[in-house]
Amino acid sequence: MLAVYLHGFILSAAMILPLGPQNVFVMNQGIKRQHHLMSASLCALSDIILICAGIFGGSALLSRSPLLLALVTWGGVAFLMWYGWGALMAAWRGDGVASSATSVTQGRWRILVTLLAVTWLNPHVYLDTFVVLGSLGGQLLPDIRPWFALGAVTASIVWFFALAFLAAWLSPWLNRPVAQRIINLFVGGVMGFIAFQLARQGFGL
């Protein structure tokens, strides 16, 4: 059982660690110390749902529906371009962290919607959880499959909360105006690059 658990943990960690929209978003919220634990919780919860769905049968749905994958891909491209453009504009204007209570309240809902979009409109999430984890986990015997899923879920939870806490710890150094401008440029560049890669996949290039 332990070997199966570790297999799921290591495989999931290997797919989560590369820089992606979720990691960038959680890192940015941690640096701002603005609902970063909520962001980590939502990312982990979304991963739990997707990982379990993929391992326990959802992978077949995605593999049999090219139209669904295309819709998710182009929805993701549009969203990432919009989000990346917003980050670049924030860097250009030198926007800082909202300080008023009203702004924080509005920010909570905006963070919630944005994070759900970053997660659920990202085709790579479905490929990782449904295709890779789902295919491998689906080949295991039913009695040990939950251990594989538990290992994969554990890696996701550990990673997102570690990222949020680390970013918050570094916040005093990274939350300065110059650093925020650099981070916004970085976020905009990453989102634009991922959108470009997704568009290439969508066109089959």
From Swiss-Prot:
InterPro entries: Arg_export_ArgO_enterobac, LeuE-type, Lys/arg_exporter. It is found in: Cell inner membrane. It catalyses: L-arginine(in) = L-arginine(out). Its main location: membrane. GO terms for cellular component: plasma membrane. Signal peptide: none annotated. This is Arginine exporter protein ArgO. It comes from Yersinia pseudotuberculosis serotype O:3 (strain YPIII). The gene is argO.
